[in-house]
From Swiss-Prot:
Principal subcellular localisation of the protein: cytoplasm
Function: Catalyzes the conversion of 3'-phosphate to a 2',3'-cyclic phosphodiester at the end of RNA. The mechanism of action of the enzyme occurs in 3 steps: (A) adenylation of the enzyme by ATP; (B) transfer of adenylate to an RNA-N3'P to produce RNA-N3'PP5'A; (C) and attack of the adjacent 2'-hydroxyl on the 3'-phosphorus in the diester linkage to produce the cyclic end product. The biological role of this enzyme is unknown but it is likely to function in some aspects of cellular RNA processing.
Pfam families, per database record: RTC, RTC_insert
Keywords per UniProt: ATP-binding, Cytoplasm, Ligase, Nucleotide-binding
Protein name: RNA 3'-terminal phosphate cyclase
GO CC aspect terms: cytoplasm
Length: 344
């Protein structure tokens, strides 16, 4: 029997990413794991609905044996079986992030025995999670360059606290994964400011994109009023398309926060990205660690190595025979991954 990998859920930034990465890697490598202190670094520790859905989705996709899969649990034991392609549907039962559930199981389905379709119901545009727009416009185009055939479709927008959204991904098994190198982003080709409004007055979106335009005069503006009772909710994004990749920065309207404050939050993050010579933003960097590790090669630059990034690297290195090297240079960090020397 494969050895059980013991993981401390409180390590590093102590969030749900440790669990999601462990589930993905356990399914792919066949190595079971035990985790204690799940989300110990959070105000509400233990498994929330979103994390529990990710655990149960992983369990169904690989026929795993699992202990500790209940709300609030800070302990989990997961013993995977073979990954099975097919049609899957999961409901979070809250406004928890559909995208984080998808990002847990999709890497495993790159190695499945056939094509798959995964549909998840919950939130699609959440604080502290990649939005559906980020997945479709930023992450998946980079995965395609690595040889991964995956396409996500937004079925219905879902915002906190109501949820009610849905997204589905169709994925084919990958013959092999290629490395990816993102050292420089190249020239900026296009900037787009977009406000999504669901049961929110139109002037809110107009003020948001106007504020972004003041920061980025080249930006194209788009205000979208969503139909179908998916609100209330408001998401603002700034998409920056460069020669080598697309980045997207987002913030969400909150009661008591002005449209201008929401826009300034996005502008601050985007300006910080553009002021750095690094190719990749801080959040995208987190999303690249697992696919690059599975490819066994690749490199990117990021303005700084966040606690989230370092924690994710530490988990990946427990499951895969790869090594990450980080080198600081010229106001940025270069992150490189390579396969471990078989003699080491």
């Amino acid at each position: 029997m494969a050895r059980i990998i013991a993981l401390d859920g409180a390590q590093g930034e102590g969030g749900g990413q440790i669990l999601r990465s462990a589930l993905s890697l356990s399914m792919i490598t066949g190595q079971p794991f035990e985790m204690s202190g799940i989300r110990a670094g959070r105000a509400k520790p233990g498994l929330l609905r979103q994390h529990l859905t990710a655990v149960r989705a992983a369990t169904e996709i690989c026929g795993a044996q699992v202990n500790g899969d209940e709300l609030g649990s800070q302990q989990l034991r997961f013993t995977p079986g073979p990954i099975r392609g097919g049609e899957y549907r999961f409901a979070i039962g809250s406004a928890g992030s559909c995208m984080l559930v998808l990002q847990t199981v999709l890497p495993a389905l790159w190695f499945a025995d056939g094509s798959s379709r995964v549909e998840v119901h919950g939130g699609t545009h959440n604080q502290a999670a990649p939005s559906a727009d980020f997945i479709c416009r930023v992450w998946e185009p980079l995965l395609a360059r690595m040889g991964i055939n995956q396409r996500t479709t937004l079925i219905k927008h879902g915002f906190y606290p109501a949820g009610g959204g849905a997204a589905a991904t169709v994925v084919e098994p990958a013959a092999s994964l290629r490395g990816l190198t993102l050292i420089s982003r190249g020239e900026t080709r296009r900037i787009t400011a977009e406000a999504l409004l669901a049961s929110v007055p139109h002037h809110v979106g107009e003020r948001e994109v106007a504020t972004l335009e003041a920061h980025f005069p080249r930006a194209e503006k788009n205000v979208v009023a969503l139909e179908g009772g998916c609100g209330p909710g408001n998401a603002l994004s700034l998409m920056i398309q460069s020669e080598q990749l697309t980045e997207l920065f987002a913030a969400f309207g909150v009661k008591g926060t002005s449209a201008e404050a929401v826009a300034n939050q996005v502008a601050h993050e985007a300006r910080r990205y553009l002021a750095s010579p690094a190719a990749v933003g801080e959040h995208l960097a987190d999303q690249l660690i697992l696919p690059l590790a599975l490819a066994g090669e690749g490199a990117f630059t990021v303005a700084r190595a966040s606690a989230h990034l370092l924690t994710n690297i530490a988990v990946v290195e427990r499951f895969l025979p790869v090594t990450f090297n980080l080198e600081e240079a010229r106001e940025m960090v270069q992150v490189m991954v390579s396969k471990k020397d078989s003699g080491s």
